[in-house]
Amino acid sequence: MNAEIERRRTFAIIAHPDAGKTSLTEKLLLFGGQIQVAGAVKSNKIKKTATSDWMDIEKQRGISVTTSVMEFDYHDYKINILDTPGHQDFAEDTYRTLTAVDSVIIVVDGAKGVESQTRKLMEVCRMRNTPVIIFVNKMDREAKDPFDLLDELEEELSIHVRPLTWPIESGPRFKGVYNIYEQKLNLFQPSKQVVTEKVEVDIHTEDLDNHIGTPLAEKLRSELELIDGVYPEFQIEDYLKGELAPVFFGSALNNFGVQELLDCFVEIAPSPRPVMAEERTVNPDEPKFTGFVFKITANIDPNHRSCVAFCKVCSGKFTRNTPYLHVRHNKTMRFSSPTQFMAQRKTTVDEAWAGDIIGLPDNGTFKIGDTLTEGENLHFKGLPSFSPEMFKYIENADPMKTKQLNKGIDQLMDEGVAQLFVNQFNGRKIIGTVGQLQFEVIQYRLENEYNAKCRWEPISLYKACWIESDDPAELETFKKRKYQYMAKDREGRDVFLADSGYVLQMAQMDFKHIKFHFTSEF
């Protein structure tokens, strides 16, 4: 059993929009033999679209909107990739994905360096001590000086770095990378093929000069000396603790430097790690199955109105058609057709091990954070909802389709696309999101998947705070006094909707015994 778990590698690829995350995912799948031709992302000349972007709206805009799950075998390893959306409006989905992975690859654009989105996501990795590998992409275009990039990575992401490959120039002068880890030179030919020319070179001989010319050879030698002098030696323990990040350079679109990244990754990345539950720590090699739902997706197949709950197996072995306990409902369920994914294509699986991600058919029984076990009462920690940044009233634009609209809103909220609050004062539904793009996605999906039309009406709100108090009388007084600001979330918890920072401050000062929370995880 342990051998099966040991060979699992489950990781997420995160980055700022357009740093080349989906291109990197495609190339990894190409090496895993999962796709024959990578769909050149967003190019209009080639009418293929990326494998991991499967929703209509993703294909139209050339961006990733939801996390895709893909798995393949590489050498002796079983690899599960989660490709996450980088657009900040979909950050909620990404935060939750990070709870289901054992390590992370961060993609950084060589010309732009570290951007805001990457910083935010890195904070979540730090909270969980997730091991990180950094891939500096687009070296075939003009890029910043590699030493400046390393300084920026250390400063912005608060982590020590150690380059394991090193670029020779960038842009039109880009010659390739030197693989410090294996002491080989990889020469660059711009093409979309899987082959790169690898040469074993002793860098202290003239062999190097013959390949890249004397001036560049001299420069490379002095840079490598500097790297050894300045950066800490690469120790796997430091990487696994989340204290040191190895750095690779390359060009995902031209498929260059990707194989080095993958080969090193499967060697050093952690197999499934223990997961914290409220009751205890769950180890992956325990004999009994446990797992939690970290994401729900409606309509992977547009012909059937079906939902799929993505479940991360935390320990033991999941077997098809075996009864498992759904802890929140306290009822036993069996799954006759659990699936594994290649973005939209899915295949039925008979068994899955710790570290795997399986899709369970869902007709409304699952919520994000639900736990499945063989009978034990367990609750896994840490799938927070953050207080939304933007709010709008959602109104029905076609009274004949009320039922479809309500069903659509329910399913989309189960997915965690946005949050729904019901105003206690007037009973109207308020949708809260992390960004403007989500409103468009909700409207588009309601119309195209549920045949329901909605319209948005503005509402001026500053923050949604979940409230609680040890003094029930004070809580009641607060709710009566602030009646026009009170709402309920989908779980029926009390939420205070402040329409300005001043209103929130005054409420906090007037009611000292009430706790105001900005995430739903408390």
Residue spans of the language-model regions?
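Structural and coupling elements of P-loop NTPases
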Residues: 1-522
